[in-house]
Each structure stands twice: as C-alpha cells, then as structure tokens.
Amino acid sequence: MSQSSAEAPVTTATGPLVIKLGGEVVGGPALAILSSDLAALTRAGARAIVVHGGGAQATRLQERLGIPVRQVAGQRVTDADTLDVMKMVVAGKLNVDLCAALVAAGARPVGLHGASGPALSAVKRPPQVYAGAGPEPVDLGLVGDITGVDRGLLELLGSGGYLPVLACLGAGADGQAYNINADTVANRVAIELGAAGLFLVSDVPGVLRDVADPASRIPSLTVAEGRALIASGAVTRGMIPKLEESFAALAEGVRRIHILGRLKPGDLAREASEPGSIGTVLVP
C-alpha cells in the first residue's frame, strides 16, 4: 500500500524543520489539521521544532482587562501588565492548547518558553528609530532581543523523540522575561540549529502578487525577486517585515523558508517534500 502524503518520508538529515504557527492558527479551527500533520511528520522520521505566537489573543485579553494596546511598526509596546498578558496567553493557554492537540494527534510535545532552560536568552531592546514612527528613538518596554538559543536542550528533546513547542518569550540573566516577536524567534532558532527548512504558517496562503486574489500565489522566490516585489509595491504591510527577516535567515544559512496557510490535511508534509506546491518557498 502506498503512503499518504501526510505519512510520506521526509528527510531532515541536514537539519530539523522549524515550524512557526501564528496565534490565529493555534487558536483557530485549523489546529487539529496542523497537529495531525505535525504528528505525521515526526512519525515519518522528521525532526521538528514548533514555535508559536499569540498576538491576536493577547490583544483581545488586553482589551477585556482594560489594558491599552500600543504598537509601533507592528511591534507590541510591552509594559509590565502587557507582559503578564503575554505570559498568560502565549506561554499559558495557547502553549497548553497546542500541546494538548498534538498529544491527541499522537505526537510527544514538550511545552517550553524562554525561561525553560533557558531556551531563549534575551536582553532588553534599546530604544531605536522605527520606520513610520517618527525621527525619535522609541522604547518598546519589555521587548527583548535574542542573545542565545539553547541548542543542546532542543536537540536533546528531538533526539528522544519529543517535539519541542516553544512560546515566544525570552529570559534575561537577571530573571526578567521579555516579549519577542514569534517570527524573530523562529528565524533565530532555524539559524542556530541549521534548519533544513523553516515554515511560517498563518492565515495567508503565501506571497501574493495581488493580496485580494489567493490564486496569485507565487510558488517560489529568490531573495532578489522578493526585494524587487517589495520595491514595486506589490508586497505591502505585514508581509514586508516577514520577508525581510526571512532574507536575513537565508543569508545566515537557513536553506529554504516556506510561507503558507489555509492548510488541508497532508499539506504540510507535501510542502516539505515538494517546496512551493502549497505556499511560497523562499530560497537564496
């Protein structure tokens, strides 16, 4: 009997797969599909690490609690109350919900956050100038820049057949926790572990020539082609920082990066074995 695409062998001899799940995915109806696909990948022999965010859910809880939501250039300004919300939502509810869904699908997840190990060492980001936010440096508060990834911890879990599930919070040497963008975490983990592929899964089906037309998905992009799209204005808004961070990760050795979303069963494994078949694959 031939194997289904979800169970087809996926080779990661050159490095693990890093899969970043946006909060809209972790908290949405596609979670069961993704959990099943991730479990199938690990059963097929793939080494994988999951990174997740939770910005949309954190925003909703802040609004319910009456905590102001401020963003600068897509970055969440994080005071002490906002950081507590991120801990509750991202390292708490969403990490547990994702791990529970993976257990139900047959995987062996281990939920982690930056202070676990610490898996993600960080320092406070100094004030800096952000595009569109005026000429003066802006202090984002308790937002961190990654200074280290505990590669040994993540590889130890993977070698034991476990699936690390990492929430996007970092920890400083002084015990201070920091909010970190999930795309940034995923890119850095992929770089540090020499990932065979990085998958950025959200509700966007890939890089589109026309944001209003899902059929305009671009299967494959080089860095030069991606920069030309940005310069032409075809790529806008949140896709620009996603592409810019991806370009930097490719320059530092990540072999390929996949941008995809709205997945059906088996799509994740298919994209891993047939790059560009489901989303957009970025290559150097």
Curated annotation (Swiss-Prot):
It catalyses: N-acetyl-L-glutamate + ATP = N-acetyl-L-glutamyl 5-phosphate + ADP. The keyword Transferase applies. One of its GO terms (cellular component) is cytoplasm. One of its GO terms (biological process) is arginine biosynthetic process via ornithine. Substrate binds at residues 54-55, 76, 179. It is an enzyme of class 2 (transferase). It is found in: Cytoplasm. GO terms for molecular function: acetylglutamate kinase activity; ATP binding. The record marks 20, 242 as: Transition state stabilizer. The keyword Heme does not apply. Its EC number is 2.7.2.8. Pathway: Amino-acid biosynthesis; L-arginine biosynthesis; N(2)-acetyl-L-ornithine from L-glutamate: step 2/4. Pfam families: AA_kinase. It comes from the Bacteria. Catalyzes the ATP-dependent phosphorylation of N-acetyl-L-glutamate. NCBIfam families: argB. Belongs to the acetylglutamate kinase family. ArgB subfamily. This is Acetylglutamate kinase.
